[in-house]
């Protein structure tokens, strides 16, 4: 009597739990194989009950639901018609060569003894040929078993072996479990091995994600007959081509009823629905974190194992996820597929484009609960919140100064390194910060809009103008708590306080000498490097400090010397024009022989040299001696 074929006789039995463990690619592959099995059964003359079950499978219905509906059994009328129908071999069915892959798919879950046309084919030589082909196929699978791709997929292959009859040719030594086909034997071995590689000697490619191994296995075993007319890409399965076409058309037929989000594949929608239900059935044994999808758990576990299977061929950098490798490779290729439609700016990642577009839309979705200030990026909000809590997480390793923003620390560190990346295009002068360069450029534009009513002096910036007015008012708002000294500017007070603390945070790496201020360290370092950035345009002579260049320029300009209004003394430089203090301030040092007084000990010592004839600096060309090295330098 002929047996009636049902969906469960062709399909691999997946429970609901097992089906949910599969990722999208594995589910699509399952549907393709089952539909191919159905096509082969029909072409060989089988009597199939409920063909609409395969139609439901093609539309995306889960196989465990189809099997559940099928348990109601066939109607008696259908069964009787199938029993009485004379099944004859189709003309020329064995005249063509039956591919091994088709035989494997037909015979994977069935031996020839359980086929419904068994009685009708008794004694037929063609039927015997099919049996021989099946056995030869099994042998071929056994011979090629070691070359086939292996991968670890417990949830896919830990299935019920529902075989009615047939010899079990392959026995697995570890458990003593038997299998009817070499492919089942190979699949079962995957449970006991953690190796994940493609065994094709010609390609030598390696993979770890299960879905890629399955897809890659299909590439090596199945001829690609379905070609996309848009881009020329070919596929071995019609459903793969159908899904691929949606990339070009943008079609997303599967829509979520809760949020309206659409997807290209039904399996993607099924995974998405778990977001709304909150279902997370896959839990990490290491940390207890749960996931809604098994593939997410697999990727997460690589954090604990440190496994990074995806390696960049350019720089050999490894990644735990393939998507991370793809994004990284864009650094080498320069590819920026995400382009802003507003300004044309391109980005390597979609998230970067999303953030950039907020500049055009003005959207600031991250709001501070303390003050209501909104930000475009969450990272900016996180840093802003440090203002309210007083937290300064960014600390300078050189001097210990801390900042709220990482950008402020980066700018501060230029003081220690001496780096001045901002250069004036007009005069070539460099600056540590962009704001300093912007202020400097106003000098060339000669925009001095702030004028002092007291003395008529003009200033570029309002802050400079305000500080200048304190000279006339005598206002000194900044007082030192240690000694009570007052200052015009807060920066002057900060520098002064270092005298009391004795802290010299700016240390020269060459000689170990420490300084109170970064500018002192910068000037000092030029002694080691020999750098002389200040060049005279008249004669080309260069100097370490700007003040030296200023003094030198007076040689070319014939500038009038500095003269004292109270006496007839004349000085070559303003820095030595201190005789005014003799007339206006207390005299600290007195020369006993001549009764002269001086406001500074250094001037007093220099004055003594006049009478003791200690002149140690001699200019050979003029044979002129000087009582001070500074006067000797000033003449140069």
UniProtKB/Swiss-Prot annotation:
GO terms for cellular component: nucleus. A zinc finger (C2H2-type) spans 196-220, 226-248, 254-276, 282-304, 310-332, 338-360, 366-388, 394-416, 422-444, 450-472, 478-500, 506-528, 534-556. One of its GO terms (molecular function) is DNA-binding transcription factor activity, RNA polymerase II-specific. It holds the Pfam family zf-C2H2. It is found in: Nucleus. SMART domains: KRAB, ZnF_C2H2. Transmembrane segments: none annotated. Keywords: DNA-binding, Metal-binding, Nucleus, Repeat, Transcription, Transcription regulation, Zinc, Zinc-finger. Its main location: nucleus. SUPFAM superfamilies: beta-beta-alpha zinc fingers, KRAB domain (Kruppel-associated box). Residues 5-76 form the KRAB domain. GO terms for biological process: regulation of transcription by RNA polymerase II. Signal peptide: none annotated. Belongs to the krueppel C2H2-type zinc-finger protein family. May be involved in transcriptional regulation. This is Zinc finger protein 790.
């Amino acid at each position: 009597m002929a047996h009636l074929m049902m969906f469960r006789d062709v399909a691999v039995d997946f429970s609901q739990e097992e089906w949910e463990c599969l990722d999208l690619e594995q589910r699509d592959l399952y549907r393709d194989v089952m539909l191919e099995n159905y096509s082969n059964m029909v072409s060989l003359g089988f009597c199939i009950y409920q063909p609409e079950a395969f139609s439901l499978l093609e539309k995306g219905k889960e196989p465990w639901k189809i099997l559940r509906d099928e348990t109601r059994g066939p109607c008696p009328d259908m069964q009787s018609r199938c029993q009485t129908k004379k099944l004859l071999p189709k003309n020329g069915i064995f005249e063509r060569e039956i591919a091994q892959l088709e035989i494997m798919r037909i015979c994977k879950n069935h031996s020839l003894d359980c086929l419904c046309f068994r009685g009708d084919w008794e004694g037929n030589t063609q039927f015997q040929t099919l049996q021989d082909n099946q056995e030869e196929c099994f042998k071929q699978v056994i011979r090629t078993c070691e070359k086939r791709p292996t991968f670890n997929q417990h949830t896919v292959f830990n299935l019920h072996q529902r075989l009615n009859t047939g010899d079990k040719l392959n026995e697995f030594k570890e458990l003593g479990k038997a299998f009817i086909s070499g492919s089942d034997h190979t699949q079962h071995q995957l449970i006991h091995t953690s190796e994940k590689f493609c065994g094709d000697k010609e390609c030598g490619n390696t993979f770890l994600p299960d879905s890629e191994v399955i897809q890659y296995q299909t590439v090596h075993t199945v001829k690609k007959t379905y070609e996309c007319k848009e881009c020329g890409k070919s596929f071995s399965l019609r459903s793969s081509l159908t899904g691929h076409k949606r990339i070009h058309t943008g079609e997303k037929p599967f829509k979520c009823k809760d949020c309206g989000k659409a997807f290209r594949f039904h399996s993607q929608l099924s995974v998405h629905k778990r977001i709304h239900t909150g279902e997370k059935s896959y839990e990490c044994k290491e940390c207890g974190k749960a996931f809604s999808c098994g593939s997410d758990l697999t990727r997460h576990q690589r954090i604990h194992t440190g496994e990074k299977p995806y390696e960049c061929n350019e720089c050999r950098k490894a990644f735990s996820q393939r998507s991370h490798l793809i994004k990284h490779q864009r650094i080498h290729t320069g590819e920026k597929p995400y382009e802003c439609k507003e300004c044309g700016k391109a980005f390597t990642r979609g998230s970067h484009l999303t953030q950039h577009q907020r500049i055009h839309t003005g959207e600031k979705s991250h709001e501070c609960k303390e003050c209501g200030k909104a930000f475009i990026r969450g990272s900016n909000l996180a840093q802003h919140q440090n203002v309210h809590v007083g937290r300064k997480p960014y600390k300078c390793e050189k001097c210990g100064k801390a900042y709220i923003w990482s950008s402020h620390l980066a700018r501060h560190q230029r003081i220690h390194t001496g780096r001045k990346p901002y250069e004036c295009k007009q005069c070539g002068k460099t600056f540590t910060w962009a704001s300093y360069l912007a202020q400097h450029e106003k000098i060339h534009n000669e925009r001095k809009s702030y004028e002092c009513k007291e003395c008529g002096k003009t200033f570029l910036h309002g802050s400079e103008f305000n500080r200048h007015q304190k000279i006339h008012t005598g206002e000194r708002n900044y007082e030192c708590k240690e000694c009570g000294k007052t200052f015009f500017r807060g920066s002057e007070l900060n520098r002064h306080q270092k005298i009391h603390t004795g802290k010299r945070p700016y240390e020269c790496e060459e000689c170990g000498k420490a300084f109170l201020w970064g500018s002192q360290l910068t000037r000092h370092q030029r002694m080691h490097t020999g750098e002389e950035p200040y060049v005279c345009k008249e004669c080309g002579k260069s100097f370490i400090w700007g003040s030296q260049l200023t003094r030198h320029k007076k040689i070319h300009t014939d500038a009038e010397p500095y003269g004292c209004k109270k006496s007839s003394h004349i000085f070559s430089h303003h820095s030595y024009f201190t005789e005014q203090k003799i007339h206006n301030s207390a005299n600290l040092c007195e020369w006993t022989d001549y009764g002269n007084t001086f406001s500074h000990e250094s001037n007093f010592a220099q004055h003594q040299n006049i009478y003791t004839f200690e002149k140690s600096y001699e200019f050979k060309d003029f044979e002129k001696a000087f009582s001070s090295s500074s006067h000797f330098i000033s003449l140069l």
